[in-house]
């Protein structure tokens, strides 16, 4: 049966989506609030140890969750795809299962040392990645409540951790250990809910394409994290704490939009995958082209206008806010188009990966000049330029394919 994407969403889908956003929103709010409170409780020195360990390990979250989750959401809903569920569970659990013993060994040797702290942060990132995939697989089985439960549990863990720090004076290593322990139990519970149902026996020949899909689909998230890391490195080179702090605030605001759109697309992705299976890949590519056709020229115009503003010496809050709005609008347009192409075949996924790599190259190159020149405004302008190139490469290729 062909699934139409133009139908009005059923009330149950709207209610489930609202509940899922509430769970994720509670976790994000708890995480950001906890960091602010921890800074006050610990002071800058101890908090820097905690924040740096988490920051360095952030790429592991993207590596262990995004590609695997997106591949599962693209392949499992299709005919015969349920047999791939154990493979995606294994791909999600393996990094966490490796990271935890390494952390335990280092913690046993030196509980308060830097190696144990970084290993705990790495295990925490892998655990969060595993949780995201397990929650997605539960959603695919119609168990959306498991996703909500998981992220509400993580929100409670953040609040409880802050409470323990206030009551006991526990330090960064101990708090990271607490979060790793919570994730170990939570992931086991999520996995148990998946193991109870029979997935059937998969054709081993389908494993390699599934792993390849997961690898290709991880590129966009990993390059996005890398672009953010490189941009912050440019700010570190400026050695201006105020400018770095201002950019951090703007980047948090942007991340709210990006994560919100990304998560909404993850919720809708199984329906998109089934729709593409029913209507054909050509229809998905045509729809992606129709989305990008106005978005890319509008984005290019925005970059030119913002460049003129920069050349005129304007780089204050109004200019930075305009750049933020332009980047948010571009992202909101480009992500759905890429979702359509990524859910077609390996050729589409390779194209999306190449476009993401080019986006990273543009952000890194433009940021090298723009961050010293205009700080937060320059960084957001570099982001806009990267988004235009990413969408432009995709649009140019789709025009060749669909003309």
Question: Could you describe each region identified by the protein language model?
Answer:
Residues 127-149, 329-355:
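Membrane-interface junctions at transmembrane-helix termini in multi-pass inner-membrane proteins
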Residues 3, 10-66, 215-242, 252-253, ...:
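Signature of the first transmembrane helix
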Residues 58, 62-80, 250, 254-279, ...:
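Helix-loop junctions and terminal segments of transmembrane helices
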Residues 44-45, 106-124, 241, 305-335, ...:
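Interfacial segments at transmembrane-helix termini and the short loops linking adjacent helices
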Residues 1-30, 193-195, 201-217, 393-403:
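N-terminal membrane topogenesis motif
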Residues 118-127, 148-199, 322, 358-362, ...:
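Hydrophobic alpha-helical transmembrane segments
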Residues 20, 24, 51-54, 91-92, ...:
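Residue-level recognition of transmembrane alpha-helices
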Residues 15-28, 53-108, 112, 277-303, ...:
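Membrane-water interface segments that mark the loop-to-transmembrane alpha-helix transition
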